[in-house]
């Protein structure tokens, strides 16, 4: 791919995201989603590997179907109510169609099948965009229409996402697939609280974005595409690997790390809403995800590959330090004491 094309595509992604999150009209929001889809496809397929082309094709087909559903939902609502305003989604059929469309775009269960496959075929930094930035516009649409959505349907999808995200990640050896199922599991936590506290759902997404970005950037630094490559990277970048372990534990939601904050606040809010069984179920299902995070963390630091003693520790490293990775990793680990302030601001 032409090197000058990448900045144009990244700017297009920023433009599409900005249009969607700042619009009040359904057609403008749909336009932003389409710009995003068309801008990310060349980034997915830029390696020209058959798997990358396959991933780009799968992504295009699913996103095109979801965008058509968004448009159909808004047209049905406009036909019934005469309103094109995003916040005026009052028609029950339109609400159901929109929930399905956004679930496809986000990769929520039962529309999650495309997401791990697309992530597996993408480069690590494109996978980072797919897991974080590309989820922001559809999530914004859900937040803007949260008062019209069906809480029972979203709770069922959320619990299914937390369950399948945990179960399907258990036997994975590819880091991108592990992070794809991690994303599905986290989306379950966001979806379950969306109707009751949209601000808390947004806070959860922000913290998930920070932690996932730190993991992807660390994996990109050590060029680790599977568990065995993570295993052999300890001798070259010990500090980065130790940091990666802490960020993974934060992503799992262990105290006293940042990732514990959203889980704690969501369980508290669900209990206030008299949804204690749902809170208990999603808390138990997060133990499934904890297992594969622990396995990845164990591979990244504790278990060393068998090799000769003179190769165990290298005093030099060819990898220069990365400031964004350091900042994101620090935020992923140290934000829990600031929970009251962050919750008050958001």
UniProtKB/Swiss-Prot annotation:
List the InterPro entries hit by this protein, alphabetically. Answer: Complex_I_Subunit_2 (IPR050175), NADH_DH_su2_C (IPR010933), NADH_UbQ_OxRdtase_chain2 (IPR003917), ND/Mrp_TM (IPR001750)
Please give the start and end residues of each transmembrane region: 1-21, 25-45, 60-80, 95-115, 124-144, 149-169, 178-195, 200-219, 242-262, 274-294, 326-346
Name of the encoding gene: MT-ND2
Source species, domain of life? Eukaryota
Where is this chain's protein located in or outside the cell? Mitochondrion inner membrane
**GO molecular function: any one?**
NADH dehydrogenase (ubiquinone) activity
Its recorded reaction(s) are: a ubiquinone + NADH + 5 H(+)(in) = a ubiquinol + NAD(+) + 4 H(+)(out)
Protein family according to the UniProt entry: Belongs to the complex I subunit 2 family.
This chain's function reads:
Core subunit of the mitochondrial membrane respiratory chain NADH dehydrogenase (Complex I) that is believed to belong to the minimal assembly required for catalysis. Complex I functions in the transfer of electrons from NADH to the respiratory chain. The immediate electron acceptor for the enzyme is believed to be ubiquinone.
For this entry, the protein name equals: NADH-ubiquinone oxidoreductase chain 2
Q: Which segments of the protein form a coiled coil according to its record?
A: none
What broad class describes the main subcellular location of this protein?
Answer: mitochondrion
Q: Which GO terms describe its biological process?
A: mitochondrial electron transport, NADH to ubiquinone
Query: GO cellular component terms?
Result: mitochondrial inner membrane
- One short Pfam name that applies is NADH_dehy_S2_C
What EC number(s) does its UniProt record assign?
7.1.1.2
Membrane topology, from the record:
Multi-pass membrane protein
What general EC class does the enzyme of this chain belong to?
translocase
Identify the keywords attached in UniProt to this record, alphabetized. Electron transport, Membrane, Mitochondrion, Mitochondrion inner membrane, NAD, Respiratory chain, Translocase, Transmembrane, Transmembrane helix, Transport, Ubiquinone
């Amino acid at each position: 791919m032409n090197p000058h094309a990448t900045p144009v595509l990244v700017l297009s992604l920023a433009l599409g995201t900005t249009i969607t999150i700042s619009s009040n009209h359904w057609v403008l929001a749909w336009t932003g989603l389409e710009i995003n889809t068309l801008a990310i496809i060349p980034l997915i397929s830029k390696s020209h590997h058959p798997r990358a082309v396959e991933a780009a094709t799968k992504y295009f087909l699913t996103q095109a179907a979801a965008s058509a559903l968004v448009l159909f939902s808004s047209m049905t609502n406009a036909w019934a109510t005469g309103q094109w305003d995003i916040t005026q989604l009052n028609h029950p059929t339109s609400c159901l169609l929109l929930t399905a469309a956004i679930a496809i775009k986000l990769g929520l269960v039962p529309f999650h099948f495309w997401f791990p496959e697309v992530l597996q075929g993408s480069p690590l930094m494109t996978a980072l965009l797919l897991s974080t930035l590309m989820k922001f516009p559809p999530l914004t649409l859900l937040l803007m229409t949260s008062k019209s959505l069906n809480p029972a349907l979203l709770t069922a999808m959320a619990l299914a996402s937390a369950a399948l995200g945990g179960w399907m990640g258990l036997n994975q050896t590819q880091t991108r697939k592990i992070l794809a199922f991690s994303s599905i599991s986290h989306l379950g936590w966001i979806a379950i609280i969306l109707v009751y506290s949209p601000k808390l759902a947004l806070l959860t997404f922000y913290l998930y974005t920070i932690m996932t970005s730190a993991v992807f950037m660390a994996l990109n630094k050590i060029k680790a595409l599977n568990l065995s490559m993570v295993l052999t990277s300890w001798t070259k970048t010990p500090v980065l690997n130790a940091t990666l372990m802490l960020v993974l534990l934060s992503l799992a939601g262990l105290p006293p790390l940042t990732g514990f904050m959203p889980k704690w606040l969501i369980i508290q809010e669900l209990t206030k809403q008299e949804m204690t069984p749902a809170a208990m179920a999603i808390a138990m299902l997060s133990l499934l995800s904890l297992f594969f995070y622990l396995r990845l963390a164990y591979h990244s630091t504790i278990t060393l590959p068998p090799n000769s003693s003179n190769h165990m520790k290298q005093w030099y490293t060819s990898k220069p330090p990365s400031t964004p990775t350091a900042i994101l990793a620090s935020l992923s680990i140290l934000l829990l004491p600031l929970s009251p302030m962050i919750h008050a601001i958001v």
